[in-house]
From Swiss-Prot:
The gene is Tmem80. The keyword Transmembrane applies. Signal peptide: none annotated. This is Transmembrane protein 80. It comes from Mus musculus (Mouse). It is a multi-pass membrane protein.
């Protein structure tokens, strides 16, 4: 259930963040190199999220530790990218903070449950 909620929220987050980056580039003086970096990191975050959800679902259905461990690693990297969009982005709007905080909470819940499930599968 959490994977479905996370996947749905990540799609919303990706779209909202993309629109906010476009907005910031039009309204504010946003450096081009920072704009390109933010767009590349957002695209990387989307690709990692798809891989994380696929491996997490596959590992959960097969009760296999390796896909879940890979999904946990992708969750950690996704959390770091969320921190980037929360704190280290060139311009951080209030909505960026809210969306990234909710995404970090979801990453934390996913990571905690993945650790518990991996420990259960190893036993």
């Amino acid at each position: 259930m959490l994977f479905h909620l996370s996947g749905l929220y990540s799609a919303l987050y990706f779209l909202a963040t993309l629109l906010m980056i476009v907005y910031k580039s039009q309204v504010f003086s946003y450096p081009c190199n920072c704009l390109a970096l933010d767009l590349v990191l957002l695209l990387l975050m989307g690709i990692l999220k798809v891989a994380q959800l696929y491996l997490g679902t596959k590992g959960n259905l097969m009760e296999a530790e390796v896909p879940l461990a890979a999904s946990l690693a992708f969750t950690a990297v996704g959390g770091l990218l969320s921190v980037h969009f929360l704190l280290w982005q060139t311009l951080v709007l209030w909505m960026d903070s809210v969306l990234s905080t909710v995404l970090l909470v979801l990453h934390g819940l996913e990571a905690g449950l993945q650790v518990v499930v991996i420990a259960d599968f190893i036993r």
